[in-house]
Amino acid sequence: MGGFVDDGAAGLAPSHGSSRAGRGLEGAGVFLRFVASLLSIAGLMLLVKDNQTVQQMVATEAVTLETKYSDISAFVFLLYTNGLVAVYCFFLALASVFSLIASARSGKLAGWVTFVLDQGLAYVLLAAAAASTEVLYLAENGDLKTSWAEICSQFGHFCHMARASIVVSFLSMLAMAVLSVMSAQQLFSKYRRPMTAKTAQDI
């Protein structure tokens, strides 16, 4: 006696399950993109406000010293990178929200573009945060070999703001790294072979 598995029953159940899982992943991605955008905005704003003016006595005269983020190229690089990540994540999150509401599915080309941009921006943000960390280390500790003096004893507020911006930027980078994994999973799931009904035979 032989049995036959109905094509509709065999194909629809896995399809609905994978569809729900896919939409759940997209929803998590939207939330994480808003988080990454907010973190990058916070890192950017901390740098924009990062300036300090102090007065130092030289002989009998008071000399005014000022430092700001724009004096350091690594901090400028970090600021623009955070701005780019914030704009990218915000608009892509909005596009994803409209896609979820309209129950529309993105194609493979859009998946590849998102995957490449997520990966690229994660690496660029990592590079910017790492370069800024090195500069901050020199500002806090100096370098005797190159005769660079530390400045954080004089510009404590400046160093504190820079440190906070770097920490927030690293958190945004971690969010981008997770998004890279998620976009890779969504992209390569489009290349999986569709499930087909199989004929079952009793021996």
From Swiss-Prot:
InterPro entries: CASP/CASPL, CASP_dom. The chain crosses the membrane at residues 28-48, 74-94, 109-129, 164-184. Disulfide bonds: none annotated. It comes from the Eukaryota. GO terms for cellular component: plasma membrane. It is found in: Cell membrane. Its main location: membrane. It is a multi-pass membrane protein. Residues 49-73, 130-163 are extracellular. Glycans are attached at N51. Residues 1-27, 95-108, 185-203 are cytoplasmic. Belongs to the Casparian strip membrane proteins (CASP) family. PANTHER family: CASP-LIKE PROTEIN 2C1-RELATED, CASP-LIKE PROTEIN 4A4. Homodimer and heterodimers. This is CASP-like protein 2U2. The lineage of its organism: Eukaryota, Viridiplantae, Streptophyta, Embryophyta, Tracheophyta.
